Structure formats: C-alpha cells, structure tokens
Amino acid sequence: MPELPEVETTRRILEPYLLGQRIQKLLHQDPARYRHTERAEGRKVLGISRRGKYLILQLDQGLEAIIHLGMTGGFRFEPHRHTRVTLVLPQQTLYYTDPRRFGKWWVVEAGDYREIGLLGRMGPEPLSPDFTPVGFKQALAQTRRKIKEVLLSQEAVAGVGNIYADESLWLSKIHPERPAHTLSPAEVKRLHRAIREVMGQAVEAGGSTLSDESYQQPNGEPGYFQFAHKAYDRTGQPCRRRGCKGRIVKMVVGGRGTHFCPVCQQNSR
C-alpha cells in the first residue's frame, strides 16, 4: 500500500491543484529521505503523471519530482499529525503525510532515474495498450520465480502490489506459488485479463483503505475497493467464487502475506 489504484486516484485529485502552479516552498526535516527537494522551489508544475506506484511532477527547466508513497504515504489538504513534507503553492498548501515514514521523494533531471533504479526497468502499465498477453507471456516464460513474486517485482507489469496480486490471482484461479514459466497460454490470458479487470475496478473505486492510518484520498475520503476484495485480508472467510466450498487461507510468499483459496487455486503444474 499504496499501489497503482491508490496512486492514480491521488494523481487525479491533485492534478487540478498542482497543474500550472509554481512551488514556493517545499518544507521538511529529512533530507536523506526527501532528496534534492530544494531544486523544486520556484519551479512551475507543467504536468502530473504516474508510473507504476510513483507520482511524477513534471517541472519547468527540465526537472522532475518523483514521489513514492511507501506503505502509508498520502496527501492532505489540511495539516496532519503525521505531516512529513509541506508543499506551499500560491493559493494552496498540500501536506504529505506518512505515519510509517517509508515514502521517498527525489527531484532529478527529467529522465535521470539513477537513484530510482526500478523506474528504469519497470514493465508496462496494466491498463495501457502496451500490456499485451503476448508480451506478458514472454516475460513470465523467462523466470522460474513464483508468480506472486513476479507480479510484485514490477518488471512484468507495473503497479501491482500485494493486494492486487492476490485479487488478480484469485480471479484467474492461479495459485500464488506456481512457477511463472509453468503457466499455460490459457492461464496467462486469464491472469492478464484479471489484472486489467481488478486494476480498472479498483481505480474507479478510489483504491483500498484498510485502516485509519493507511491510504486515504487527499480529500479525506477512503477508497472503497476493500468492500470488493475476494481474497486479500479475508483469512478464514468463505471463498466468494460461486460453487466453491473453500475458505481463504494466508501464507507467506516472497516475504509477503498472501491470501488465496486452496480449493479453487490449486497448485497444479
């Protein structure tokens, strides 16, 4: 958390407040975590985009501000007890909050991502035309890692984190420990379709909010996709697939808590 749907929701809400505005001050007390931010002061925001889980502010004079929200990062329109960065604009002040302090900021020359290596090797956006079944199949065929680990790596497809990997694997009936290269063409197509469906629905629902200190939209509203979860955070509850008698179990895959139905997501190869 936050993953692509939460970051995209944040981008859409912030865009009208940021676009065309000049950053007057960018205040914080952690230069090791929020790097080179003094370079953004006095710069106009020409655009706000997203790549995977990263927000990217295009600034004038060839700079970009890259923001990774970490596990608990987000923006607010009012001061918050966990405010870490204050972004002062001519007619608005935005407050970046992060209770667990895992988020990071960088201000870099546009396209210079040497400090942010993942941006340079990230896979296609799941809701873009670049994310194709053929390309996805080629990426999975090249690795013996477990499919859940591959999805989390961001290299086969961008922006899929723990929640939406579990949801996509549930929807496609694929066990999270299946070696990626063993997926059949039909399974790859199902997973490709599931990722697009889950991500699209989650974006429209404003993402998922799991607790009071987890992701919220900048206006203070929660996301609502958690009410549609089929696997994530449903340990011990009945599987929601029609006709399935299983219950959701939790295990660890790639160091991450992983939720799935052992009845309809069997580890057959």
Segments predicted by a language model, with ranges:
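A short, charged helix-loop
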Residues: 103-145
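Basic, nucleic-acid-binding surfaces and adjacent catalytic neighborhoods in DNA/RNA-processing proteins
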Residues: 22-40, 49, 54-56, 60, ...
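Generic detection of long, well-ordered alpha-helical segments
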Residues: 1-4, 126, 130, 137, ...
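Generic structural signal for hydrophobic residues
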Residues: 10, 14, 136, 164-165
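Acidic, proline/glycine-enriched N-terminal capping motif
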Residues: 1-119, 258, 262-269
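Active-site donor-binding loop signature of nucleotide-sugar glycosyltransferases
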Residues: 69, 124, 241
